[in-house]
Amino acid sequence: MLSQDSNDDTEDVSLFDAEEETTNRPRKSKIRHPVASFFHLFFRVSAVVVYLLCELLSSSFIACMVTIILLLSCDFWAVKNVTGRLMVGLRWWNHIDEDGKSHWVFESRKSTPQDNKTISEAESRIFWLGLIACPVLWVIFAFSALFSFRVKWLAVVIMGVVLQGANLYGYIRCKVGSKKNLTSMATSYLGKQFLRQNTGDGQTS
């Protein structure tokens, strides 16, 4: 199931490809894992809502901070260990070998002719929307707390950025592969944008 990269302390598997998924496997819009989809959004959205309304709901900063940290911790565990595997077939984790060396493993479910399971497009959209949108919100909250001198909230906001950013980074690595693939993908994208811009300028002139 896993192919190891000898030049990196990570392990990757064959990754989902959009074209192969479209041609080889039927896509359905219905939600196949409603409970997982619910909890994928519940903890992270609840943490954001509590952060925004905590000063209105409670005068105790400690109570609000503990509630937000608990919600963020539950979200990190649920997204890392449950919802990613069920909703999009991705998983990342760490293990230490016999020599005490740490290895990061990034897994993606392989598409095989024997696999009759369908991919839920609705679940995929829910997963990636929640995975990307919430860390962006926490980054905005971090700048807001910094510039408004709400120093006491910085620790809470930074924890939100770190925990949800870690899941985002891990699943992006699962999706695009190793660092080399991620770098080449970014380079290829920038090259295409540069070429397209130059082509457009040439046609205009």
UniProtKB/Swiss-Prot annotation:
Gene Ontology CC terms: membrane
Membrane spanning residue stretches: 34-53, 54-72, 126-146, 152-172
InterPro entries (alphabetical): TVP23-like
Sites of N-acetylmethionine modification: 1
Pfam families listed in its UniProt record: DUF846 (PF05832)
Compositionally biased tracts (Acidic residues): 1-21
Region described as Disordered: 1-27
Signal peptide: none
Keywords linked to the UniProt accession: Acetylation, Membrane, Transmembrane, Transmembrane helix
Mode of membrane association: Multi-pass membrane protein
Subcellular localization: Membrane
Family note: Belongs to the TVP23 family.
Protein name (record): Golgi apparatus membrane protein TVP23 homolog B
Primary gene name: Tvp23b
